[in-house]
Amino acid sequence: FGYSGHIPEQVAVGDVIQVLNIGGVLGICDSVNPDRGQPFDARVLGCVLQFPFLGERIGVPARVGYHRLDQAAVLDTHGVPIVALAGTCMEAGKTAAACAIVSRMRHRGLAVHAFKATGVSLRRDILAMEDAGARRSQIFTDFGIVTTTAASGPALTRTMLTEMTQGKPDVVIFELGDGILGAYGVEAILSAPDIARSLTAVILSAN
């Protein structure tokens, strides 16, 4: 849809890499959608630091995510109804549908939690769900995953379903970014027997 690329084996100050999406994913661009034009170049200035020790000016390299993904995570939805939104492709209207459902349920007084399980790191969609009325939200990036695959998608979904059903909301809604047959792991998620059994409804957006 836009750009695809890879992570360089190493970077140094002064190197030029590319901005691969509006969520700030950086890397070496391998292919370009002609409709989008060339990606922006970004020159490496240094490493982003975080300061985990209160009162100490000791910086350590920042990492994506505040949790480490457990590939052996066990699914527990705590009896909460689950609605999944999938699509035939990108830009099929999944987020718009999710936001409309969240808004309507919130209008009826229901507590709704929402998350995005697959895709490339970009908080825009879950922020839109929050704006629509979701009480809590999450995205796969919170677990250190910048781009999902079939290898990470099922474990991410189990983990987020378990976390987002804690506190017993009335319903959890989650979006599966990209298409069912795309490279981001949607097919693997929907094919997982335990995840499939946990779903109350699946809504398909077609384009």
Place the predicted regions along the sequence by residue.
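Conserved Switch II/interswitch segment of TRAFAC-class P-loop GTPases
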Residues: 179-181, 198-207
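Long, basic/Gly/Ser/Thr-rich N-terminal segments
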Residues: 1-47
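Conserved active-site and cofactor/substrate-binding residues in soluble primary-metabolism enzymes
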Residues: 20, 24, 80-83, 92-96, ...
